[in-house]
Amino acid sequence: MGSQLALKSRIHSTESLAKIFNAQEMIASSHIAKARDVALNAKPYSDAIFDAVQALVAHTHITHPIAVKDENNPRVAVLALTSDRGMAGPYTSSIIRETESLLSRLDAAGKQPELFVYGRRGSTYYKYRNRDIAATWEGNTDQPGVEIAETISDTLMDAYMKPAEKGGVSELYIVYTEFINMVVQKVRVLRMLPVEIVQNETKVPSPDEAAPSTADIAPLYTFEPSLEKVLDAILPKYIQSRIHECLLTAAASETASRQNAMHTATDNARNLIDDLTRKLNASRQASITQELTEIIGSADALTKKEE
């Protein structure tokens, strides 16, 4: 009887958890379409800014901080984009794992990484382990706005433009999760500054192939009023657009990861309920069989006694 009560209690608690998991899955499902569309809509603007920066760096000989790293400054900024809430599967743990790997590689290279964290789960993880954190931001990791992107970009810009003797950094890295589709989300490490030139693979076309289109050729720009002023103006826009794009694709990844995790948790809870129900029924059947056996045995004993 006691085992049956324990099984009933476990079934009841598991049913309650299944309802919570299913509700979380439905909420994530209602948010994922918007999160995906917002991330995709932000990409063209970010790509256009990046193309302009690429043109600045590739077609001019400049010594601006946007393109030239201070080799004498070993300090490096690393921004990790985690989540505020749990129940998102391996989302935050994957970011932390990749961040730790990046920090180890930077340490091995003689760098001095400074950690910046976005998301309550990440900041809690590092604070619990007494790790030094330069700055943290929390709130709405699954629905980030332009304001938080501006705040983060301003902080990182100040750190990057600050002289080395005043604690400035020579490189900016961001660790985030890129949304590929509902099933696949990949952790990426992006070096935002100094800007790296992305070389498109080119080949000599054969006689039967068409010549490369103008879309494959880097555009030419005229910089007014001057190259230096254009660089100063475009640098904060570049940082903000890249961070905003990373925040949005990370938010879509978090929502997709949460939906997948809650779907799996709901299925596991239902499977556990079925398993516990079978055990409960088997226990009931055994109890009934035992009672019937005792009744029959008692009846036989009484019959023999009367004879």
Curated annotation (Swiss-Prot):
GO terms for cellular component: plasma membrane; proton-transporting ATP synthase complex. InterPro entries: ATP_synth_F1_ATPase_gsu, ATP_synth_F1_gsu. It is a peripheral membrane protein. It comes from Bifidobacterium longum subsp. infantis (strain ATCC 15697 / DSM 20088 / JCM 1222 / NCTC 11817 / S12). Belongs to the ATPase gamma chain family. It comes from the Bacteria. This is ATP synthase gamma chain. It is found in: Cell membrane. The gene is atpG. Its main location: membrane. One of its GO terms (biological process) is proton motive force-driven plasma membrane ATP synthesis. It holds the Pfam family ATP-synt. The keyword Membrane applies. CDD domains: F1-ATPase_gamma. The keyword Ion transport applies. Produces ATP from ADP in the presence of a proton gradient across the membrane. The gamma chain is believed to be important in regulating ATPase activity and the flow of protons through the CF(0) complex. HAMAP family: ATP_synth_gamma_bact (MF_00815). Keywords: ATP synthesis, Cell membrane, CF(1), Hydrogen ion transport, Ion transport, Membrane, Transport.
